[in-house]
Amino acid sequence: MADTEEENVQRQIDEVEALTSIYGDEWCVIDEAERIFCITISDSSNKPTWTLCLQVILPPDYPVASPPLYQLNAPWLRGEDRLTLSNCLEEMYLQNLGENILYQWVEKIREFLVEKSQTSDPGPSLKSTSEETDVGDDCEVSTDELTESFKNSMIFGMNYSSGVEEIPPIVHGETISDRRSTFQAHLAPVVSPYQVKLILNKLYENKKIATATHNIYAYRIYIKERNSFIQDCEDDGETAAGKRMLHLMQILDARDVMVVVSRWYGGILLGPDRFKHINNCARNVLMEHNYCSTVEESSKQTSKSKKSSQRK
């Protein structure tokens, strides 16, 4: 065991040194103690059209027994593009089990960006969008948030080996329409982050959902042994919507569940009303399927306590 640990440490050191030599300043150390690194990758070194940031954490048992944990950050990387690229990276890992994989990942991402630049797909700044920027919205991912996200993933582990895990049942909520925009929630029980990917893949098989302007999601998984949660969210281009939806789920104490809200933009900006509709869709489907009973019971208990205190 000790020999394997030493081998992993040495191979990680050698890999990081090689990547630093190859990519120079593009390769950045976020937290050396936590083994968190990032690199900005573009389709061209001269006038890049497509750029994204790959952030990784190297677990103690990488590369011998587990993959790097990773996060892809780019405002334009959404929906099917994100899933396609993630699937490519994970398939590449499975084809090279036990090997150092970061260089291959970086070059695969670069190849993906070059292919996008050579298609008729316009650059990210030219794409039509329904994004409505609010003052105070924070689109950047802080180092603390990134570290916490990675640690959460490490607590539960990423399941690359189980290809037989069943896709949880997905239910669909009622639609809400306002000024030609339509919103609809989709809900599924989840007990692992791996199931989140399965659910997204399944939803994107539906062409209507796949072509939604935004598919915002949030999930919370309760880890009883640690009395803690694995939780995350995705705006999918609708700035801050994912965080707001996750906050709602925290208030409702929703556990072991994922909610995706699809928005089909109708050409008229809704302003703050869009957040109200997104959260109402999420709240309605959570209540309909009894994922906020704990909060309701707690509220009733609090109400009873207040009445009792008033009588005294």
UniProtKB/Swiss-Prot annotation:
The residues covered by the RWD domain are 14-116
Q: In which tissues is it expressed?
A: Ubiquitous both in embryo and adult.
Polar residues composition bias: residue spans: 118-128
Pfam annotation, one family: UPF0029
Q: Which GO terms describe its molecular function?
A: protein sequestering activity
* Keyword tags: Cytoplasm, Differentiation, Neurogenesis, Repressor, Stress response, Translation regulation
A single GO CC term for this protein reads: cytoplasm
For this protein, the record's SMART domains field holds: RWD
Top-rank lineage group of the source organism: Eukaryota
Q: Which GO terms describe its biological process?
A: cellular response to amino acid starvation; GCN2-mediated signaling; intracellular signal transduction; negative regulation of transcription by RNA polymerase II; neuron projection extension; positive regulation of neuron differentiation; regulation of cytoplasmic translational initiation in response to stress; regulation of translational initiation
Which locations, inside or outside the cell, does it occupy?
A: Cytoplasm
Region feature Disordered, mapped onto this chain: 118-138
Quaternary form?
Interacts with GCN1; prevents the interaction of GCN1 with EIF2AK4/GCN2 and inhibits EIF2AK4/GCN2 kinase activity. Interaction with RPL39; this interaction occurs in a GCN1-independent manner. Associates with ribosomes; this interaction occurs in a GCN1-independent manner. Associates with actin; this interaction occurs in a GCN1-independent manner.
| Protein task | Translational regulator that ensures constant high levels of translation upon a variety of stress conditions, such as amino acid starvation, UV-C irradiation, proteasome inhibitor treatment and glucose deprivation. Plays a role as a negative regulator of the EIF2AK4/GCN2 kinase activity; impairs GCN1-mediated EIF2AK4/GCN2 activation, and hence EIF2AK4/GCN2-mediated eIF-2-alpha phosphorylation and subsequent down-regulation of protein synthesis. Plays a role in differentiation of neuronal cells by stimulating neurite outgrowth.
Family per record: Belongs to the IMPACT family.
Extra remark beyond the main annotation: In contrast to the mouse or rabbit ortholog, the IMPACT locus is not imprinted in Xenopus.
Q: What is this protein called?
A: Protein IMPACT
Q: What organism is this sequence from?
A: Xenopus laevis
Taxonomic lineage of this organism?
Eukaryota, Metazoa, Chordata, Craniata, Vertebrata
